Amino acid sequence: MRVLVLGGGVVGVASAYYLARAGHEVTVLDRQPGAGLETSFANAGQVSPGYSAPWAAPGIPLKAMKWLMMRHRPLVLWPRLEPRLYGWLAQMLANCTEEAYRRNKGRMVRLAEFSRDALRELRAETGIAYDHREKGTLQLFRTRKQLDHVGEDTSVLDEYGVAYEVLDEGGCIAAEPALARVRGGFVGGLRLPGDETGDAHLFTQRLAAICARRGVSFRYGVTVARLRHEAGRITGVETGTGEVLTADAYVAAMGSYTPALLRPLGLALPVYPVKGYSLTLPVTDESAAPVSTVMDETFKVAITRLGDRIRVGGTAELAGFSGTLRGPRRATLERSLRDLFPAGGDARQAQFWTGLRPMTPDGTPIVGPTVYDNLYTNTGHGTLGWTMACGSGRLLADLITGRAPEIAHEDLSGARYLKAA
């Protein structure tokens, strides 16, 4: 079967890998000059099934109001006359119940655990190297209140058999020795030993090279203008130059830009671009740098070790498709780094970056078929595209091939999210 994958980020390239492995003839289209140059370029670097959770949670509306007032706020909302944003926010608020949170977190953890295992298998199959480490994630709590609420997450982790450790200050220092330098600045943490870290951009580029050697065609610098359709099927992809490309099946994996592509087909995806920022800086003192990933719960910032670099990523800015780099967001990232790893790296040498995370209101991605019988979606992963990429690609390849998927998937499919526009 000939398959066109629209989008060359980590999710699209992982989809191409598993489709090619299943024996399909695959072509990937992307508007950039190479793979992984948009949202996958400089994300936080976490492969974190244990930390997979929806932003929509009990208490979030009140917390969000508090965050919006903070100087170093993890959430930024730019007032906009954009009905789609406010509709998306309303859907998110509707998912802030205890019942919805447990349901959404459960399916996210299920996909993320499957994806982490698929990544490990892919690594064994290919020998791919991408500055990965298998040393877990430490969610760090600065306040007793944060630590006292950890049971809300561990109950779901128990349900899905995800390993974890609740640590006191000494336990956190044992996991991340450099934190001894800031003893007293935190009270405890939640360690997720099964989590990993790695450079998503490097992974995407090297996996694309592996795919190319296995016969996958990559066409870069190609803009997808629209999808042609007839009688409930997609009949072709029209590019920005007017060229029409055809296939037997089509995968929409264009991140935050997927809804605009599908809207003319009468499909409305509840995916909104949530802007994130990162700093990437060289390690200046090995003993003062993180070992793996430390999640600063107060500022919602991830500080990750990637080889001889430190990646500091975070913030959630609701500003449409703006790519503007904003100084206050950099200040927040630098503040978190300075508080926890003040001597680990030199922020003056940091590369400052921003990307658009494709978020659904309930945190769950949209992976599976649509009402068009040869059109599939693989988008809406939010902050967890790197975590869920391999599992989503493998699941999608099974669905397109007609094989029974290895995990429950009905609640991940387009039928749950797609509706008539």
From Swiss-Prot:
Its EC number is 1.4.99.-. Pathway: Amino-acid degradation; D-alanine degradation; NH(3) and pyruvate from D-alanine: step 1/1. The keyword Magnesium does not apply. FAD binds at residues 3-17. GO terms for biological process: D-alanine catabolic process. GO terms for molecular function: D-amino-acid dehydrogenase activity. It comes from the Bacteria. InterPro entries: DadA, FAD-dep_OxRdtase, FAD/NAD-bd_sf. Keywords: FAD, Flavoprotein, Oxidoreductase. One of its GO terms (cellular component) is plasma membrane. Coiled coil: none annotated. It catalyses: a D-alpha-amino acid + A + H2O = a 2-oxocarboxylate + AH2 + NH4(+). Signal peptide: none annotated. Its cofactor is FAD. Belongs to the DadA oxidoreductase family. Oxidative deamination of D-amino acids. This is D-amino acid dehydrogenase. It comes from Methylobacterium nodulans (strain LMG 21967 / CNCM I-2342 / ORS 2060). The gene is dadA.
